[in-house]
């Protein structure tokens, strides 16, 4: 009995110490009293392009749980197969290309045949037909959902750089490790190492085959030891993105021109309803599919688990916005998600307010910059260039927003008596506050016509 009491006492002591430690650490975890537009902190150069990495240990990224990267793949550049320890959403900012992914346990569904035999590789043995998992065509505006542990590759088959941005959710249950972004390389290497991993000595990052003995690889693949050593890329300094010499012969569906002048799209292979070939890509750059559209102002499109069911697994969603000069997104906050806002084109003036009613961001933000929008923080966007375009990644598969002004806003839902007494204004002023803005999301902005604040 005494032994049991001692164990219980010891356990309670540990629990108290742990809670005390957590209480000391947690207050500093999300003290977001000053936010900044973020730039990449590390550039990883390769033969066929570069990877730009944001420091996810920065307070606002650490609090939101996001890790953020930008990939620039030059023409004929191949981003070699890699998987992550977290689910991610990738957005095509510029260019076009091909993308393939390998879902664990799924069979090859793309096979060479008279229908899908375009661009077959050179030097293949007579009668040999390749087969592999799904390959997709990519274009600007495509948003790609990738679960953790799924190997993925990209190829630029265009004449301009293929630019992608990716947000990984390190705080989700897809990540069973620490809050470090860990790319696992199937092929290639990273001569510069992973500077963003705290506490790890800087050294070259090799692919996962490098850690196995060549003899073991030879037995596993039933190949000779020399070929096994080639898999390890030990003498290869091209990096994660390599240049492809000559034709890139992979099996993929042909493109057909969309109706009414729309962007080309793939011919379906008839298997999209199965788990192994479930749809993971949605294009957000078509205004005709937008959730909010006004020709004079712009459009906003959302992507969630209702229109892309794989997002239920990732617990992520996205929002694409494009607004014209002097258009404004009415002040709003994310109800159930953090967001990472990346500017793809143009400039805007953004103000953000925290739970203390303090303005924590009041700056211009421009193309290539990243801004974290924490849950509950109210934010206003005002385009100051000819056009402002952005993509937001959110940490909920069905992220919701609420607005401060407009037809569906919190103010519209309050009784006039609450507004008059809460702000000490007349009933007439309360009516103007509640009913003057008839838009729901986008409005024109001409602040000088409304006068200046009292000193």
Swiss-Prot record:
Subcellular location: Protein storage vacuole
Lineage: Eukaryota, Viridiplantae, Streptophyta, Embryophyta, Tracheophyta
Phosphothreonine, modified sites: 109, 395, 420
Protein name per its UniProtKB record: 12S seed storage protein CRB
Entry GO MF terms: nutrient reservoir activity
UniProt tissue specificity: Accumulates in seeds 8 days after anthesis.
InterPro entries: 11S_seedstore_CS, 11S_seedstore_pln, Cupin_1, RmlC-like_jellyroll, RmlC_Cupin_sf, Seed_Storage-Functional
Biological processes per GO annotation: cellular response to abscisic acid stimulus; response to abscisic acid; seed maturation
SUPFAM superfamilies (UniProt xref): RmlC-like cupins
GO cellular component, as recorded: protein storage vacuole
Pfam families: Cupin_1
Positions of disulphide bridges: 30-63, 106-276
């Amino acid at each position: 009995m005494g032994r049991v009491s001692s164990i219980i006492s010891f356990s309670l002591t540990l629990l108290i110490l742990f809670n005390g430690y957590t209480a000391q650490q947690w207050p500093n975890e999300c003290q977001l009293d000053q936010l900044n537009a973020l730039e990449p902190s590390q550039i990883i150069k390769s033969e066929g392009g570069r990877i730009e990495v944001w420091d996810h240990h920065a307070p606002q990224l650490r609090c939101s749980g996001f890790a953020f990267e930008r990939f620039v793949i030059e023409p004929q550049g191949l981003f070699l197969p890699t998987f992550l320890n977290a689910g991610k959403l990738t957005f095509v900012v510029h260019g076009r290309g091909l993308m393939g992914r390998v879902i664990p346990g799924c069979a090859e569904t793309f096979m060479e045949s008279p229908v899908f035999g375009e661009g077959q590789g050179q030097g293949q043995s007579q009668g040999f037909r390749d087969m592999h998992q799904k390959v997709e065509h990519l274009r600007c505006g495509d948003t790609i959902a990738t679960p953790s542990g799924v190997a993925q590759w990209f190829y630029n088959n265009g004449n301009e750089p293929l630019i992608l941005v990716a947000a990984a959710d390190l705080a989700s249950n897809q990540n069973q490790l620490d809050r470090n972004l860990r790319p696992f390389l199937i092929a290639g290497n990273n001569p510069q190492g992973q500077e963003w991993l705290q506490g790890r000595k800087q050294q070259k990052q090799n692919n996962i085959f490098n850690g196995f003995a060549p003899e073991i690889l030879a037995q596993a693949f039933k190949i000779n030891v020399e070929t096994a050593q080639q898999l390890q890329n030990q003498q290869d300094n091209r990096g994660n993105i390599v240049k492809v010499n000559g034709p890139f012969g992979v099996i993929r569906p042909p493109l057909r021109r969309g109706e009414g002048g729309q962007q080309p799209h793939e011919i379906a292979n008839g298997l999209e309803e199965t788990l192994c070939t479930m749809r993971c890509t949605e294009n957000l750059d078509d205004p005709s599919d937008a959730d909010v559209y006004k020709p004079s102002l712009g459009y906003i499109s959302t992507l969630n688990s209702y229109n892309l069911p794989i997002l239920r697994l990732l617990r992520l969603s996205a929002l694409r916005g494009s607004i014209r000069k002097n258009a404004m997104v009415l002040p709003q906050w994310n109800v159930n998600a953090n967001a990472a806002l990346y500017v793809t084109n143009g400039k805007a003036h953004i103000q953000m307010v925290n739970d203390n009613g303090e303005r924590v961001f009041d700056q211009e933000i421009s193309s290539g910059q990243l801004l974290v929008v924490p849950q509950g923080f109210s934010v206003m966007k005002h385009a100051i260039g000819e056009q402002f375009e952005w993509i937001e990644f959110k940490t909920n598969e069905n992220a919701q927003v609420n607005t401060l002004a407009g037809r569906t806003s919190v103010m519209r839902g309050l009784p006039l008596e609450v507004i008059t007494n809460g702000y000490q204004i007349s009933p007439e002023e309360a009516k103007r506050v509640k009913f003057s803005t008839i838009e729901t999301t986008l409005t024109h902005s001409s602040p000088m016509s409304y006068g200046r604040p009292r000193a």
